[in-house]
Amino acid sequence: MKRVALINDLSGFGKCSLTAAIPVISVMGMQACPLPTAILTAQTGFSSYYCDDYTDKMDYFTEEWKKLGVTFDGIYSGFMSDAGQIQKVLHFLQEFKKETTLYLADPVLGDHGQTYDVFSEELLQGMKELTTQAEVITPNLTELCLLTETDYGEVISCKKNANYLKIIEGLCHKLIAKAEVGQTIMVTGIVRQKETGDVVGNLAVSEKETYYVESPYTGKGFSGTGDLFASVICGSLVKGLSVREAMDKATHFLQEAIEEASRENIPGVHGVNFEKYLSRLL
């Protein structure tokens, strides 16, 4: 059985991070091996939450797993509470990332033009270093702009332009040029205005190809959708699917869950009821 290390936080509410990744990777027929970066009562979008930082415990996982002699077919990292955790992940990669290991980094920094509470310049610089090691990164547009030091407002002001996706593609190539491995960047949650209505799309860019897939935009955002997307992508690529196949699978899976959550008026911080759609990933 293939094995994926999941480096992310564990939140009691919000259906995100590890509570999203573990069921997705498991249902896709792989062993999910969680390495928690923090344990929270609820994800940080809630008005109140308690966070137990795991920075000083992360190395225990690395060292104990080394003693077991285990290997990983995939490594997926997400939320980091500070730059110190990024150094722990870099150490983990040194120990466990082999030539055949797929590493996916989700550079959790912000959304909708705003940075998250944990953001700092030190965290950003660390994330820039971390993403150079990844075969796949899955930023949203805000995170892509932060990583490329691009003004988000200037980019988003072009979303009615015909060349909007080309502008985003150009930013991706700026990052790819700095990567230490062959890299694919998948930009998530790109909202575009079309005559038939607003759509939300995901854009995959590599040196070899560009691929874009979209679905109707409900106008609402939900906790954990980026984590679910990254988890499906990671699982699909580790299983040997192509980038296009992985993108299609992740997009269609999320579309159903998001449309239902919108119909049911589920508060965004609680995430989507993805569990009933896990069979789509078999």
Where do the model's predicted regions map?
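Short pre-catalytic strand/loop immediately N-terminal to key active-site residues, enriched for Gly-Thr
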Residues: G12, T210-G224
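Short, small-residue alpha-helix embedded
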Residues: C145, K220-V243
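Conserved N-terminal subdomain of the carbohydrate kinase-like
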Residues: M1-A105, L109-D117, E275-R280
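Phosphate-handling active-site elements
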Residues: E209-Y211, S236-A250
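Charged C-terminal helix
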Residues: R244-L282
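Fold-independent oxyanion-binding glycine-rich loops
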Residues: N8-L10, T37, G78-F79, D106-V108, ...
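Conserved phosphate/ATP/ADP-binding segment of small-molecule kinases
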Residues: D117-T210
